[in-house]
């Protein structure tokens, strides 16, 4: 079990304040805990996950009292809550089964990000979304050939804060080839479906990735990657 904490804040002297502006100095406290549990010497069953909580002040210059009273001097001194404050969580979990001496693997995962989970440490992180996925991974020919079947579902706006809810489901196959005389090869074939009240989007995606290392001399080498996409 691991515990992690982080504090983000904007420097007041680097932000010019104007009445009616849209951007204000912010601060955020982030705490998370992740874990991993395995059963058996060969780790036949593995369970891992992480949960994180975020307390965010969207305007540190807001001097109004919060709508809730926590009656805690520690909270008042360190978190300094006000009417711009919010709290939300994010979590992920993965249940993994290692079968037939690890040659076959079944993975079932889930990722959840609350609508208010926004902070500078994870810029661009999609929020208000719940994702579930399942994968079957099969190793063949001494791990030189790997086949992966996958199914992914995703739903946003579970908080009903958005005007439109978009559902996505995806299924496909990955083929990985790892032979010493040939480039490392991955072929991915996916079917992606998006649907909401305004439109329905369906596409087939084929991706080819080639990776080859070249030894130029005893002390130097080169790596070449070729990636092609068709949809």
Regions inferred by a protein language model and the residue ranges of each:
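Exposed, low-structure sequence patches enriched in small/polar residues
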Residues: 3-7, 11, 23-231
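Substrate-binding cleft/loops of secretory-pathway carbohydrate-active enzymes
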Residues: 20
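Outer-membrane beta-barrel transmembrane domain signature
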Residues: 14-15
